[in-house]
């Protein structure tokens, strides 16, 4: 992994009791060695693979001002991290989920992009076997389950200050509270809505097919082309590029997809991250509720699966063998 560490600061928040969250500040930056590099690579990999929300700094953000000063005037990164940890403690202490942890400020470069990653990492206990085959307790940072993490794309922030996506953060296992906490700490607002962008793309695809008066098979072929491209981008960690996507879709009318979507006012960005759950709707129907969970290929609607809108009834012709086997065994058991 081509990841170059510039500087890392570690501090700690310690929960003394239900009302007290103390700060333990390190007096020097963390030296970069093999163990530190491995930790940052793992943190970068785990964070990059998770679903993130996008944001931007509010005008007058204290953290943004401090970071800007730190970078423009070449101020002490350690001092910046120490002051920011104090603000982090003040915000985190407002929430009942505050448990403390190791606070990491990592400035690094990856593929010519400069980042600042801020994370609160929990420590966990585990067991290990030593050379004498004795069991010892060891402590480790639980990076895989980290959910209090934010990352600033410093390159994007400084070269394109009008961007709505240079700041990202995780939603977290406790939902909106973690999002609120990071918004308060960073003094930021939510920016690019990736789900809305993906939903807009799906609507544009459906309207594009309808405008060209395509039949069912032709529509599904276009949806499959869109899904294949978007899924490839998702797997590669790349964003959906509308211009590239338009080239992947075989022309079906007088206008190509890019021209059509631009003229119809879907307000799609030139590029945006793919959302796996939303894109799945291109090829599948899925839903759950009331004790029922179901998903099926979109091509089956109208062939083996029929929906009566008036009665809200789905009729399935030909059940999957494993489901049919369970139903038969339950029926036979009931008849004995």
Swiss-Prot record:
MF annotations from Gene Ontology: double-stranded DNA binding; single-stranded RNA binding
Signal sequence, start to end: none
GO cellular component, one term: cytoplasm
Coiled coil: none
Localization of this protein: Cytoplasm, Nucleoid
Similarity comment: family membership: Belongs to the YejK family.
Presence of the UniProt keyword Phosphoprotein in the record: no
Identification of the protein by name: Nucleoid-associated protein Spro_3255
Database matches in Pfam families: NA37
Keyword terms, alphabetized: Cytoplasm
Transmembrane segments: none
Origin: domain of life: Bacteria
């Amino acid at each position: 992994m081509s990841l170059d560490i510039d500087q890392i600061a570690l501090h700690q928040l310690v929960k003394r009791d239900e009302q007290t969250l103390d700060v333990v500040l390190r007096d020097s930056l963390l030296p970069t060695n093999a163990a530190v590099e491995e930790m940052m690579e793992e943190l970068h990999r785990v964070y990059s693979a998770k679903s993130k929300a996008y944001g931007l700094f509010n005008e007058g953000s204290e953290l943004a001002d401090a970071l800007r000063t730190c970078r423009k005037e070449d101020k002490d990164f350690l001092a910046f991290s120490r002051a920011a940890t104090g603000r982090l403690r003040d915000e985190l202490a407002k929430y009942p989920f505050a448990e403390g942890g190791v606070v990491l400020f990592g400035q690094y470069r990856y593929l010519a992009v400069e980042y600042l990653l801020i994370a609160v990492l929990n420590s966990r206990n585990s067991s290990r076997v030593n050379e004498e085959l004795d069991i010892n307790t060891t402590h480790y940072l639980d990076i895989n389950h980290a959910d209090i993490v934010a990352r600033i794309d410093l390159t994007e922030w400084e070269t394109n200050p009008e961007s709505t996506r240079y700041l990202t953060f995780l939603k977290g296992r406790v939902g909106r509270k973690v999002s609120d906490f990071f918004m308060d700490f960073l003094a930021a607002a939510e920016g690019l809505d990736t789900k809305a962008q993906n939903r807009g793309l799906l609507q544009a695809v459906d309207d594009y097919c309808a405008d060209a008066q395509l039949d069912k098979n032709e529509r599904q072929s276009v949806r499959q082309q869109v899904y294949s491209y978007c899924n490839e981008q998702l797997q590669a960690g790349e964003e959906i590029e509308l211009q590239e996507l338009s080239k992947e879709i075989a022309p079906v009318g007088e206008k190509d997809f890019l021209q059509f979507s631009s003229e119809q006012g879907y307000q799609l960005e030139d590029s945006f991250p793919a959302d796996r759950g939303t894109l799945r709707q291109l090829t599948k129907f899925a839903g759950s509720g009331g004790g029922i969970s179901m998903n099926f290929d979109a091509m089956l609607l109208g062939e083996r699966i029929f929906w009566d809108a008036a009665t809200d009834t789905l009729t399935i012709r030909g059940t999957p063998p494993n489901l049919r086997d369970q139903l038969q065994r339950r029926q036979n058991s009931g008849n004995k």
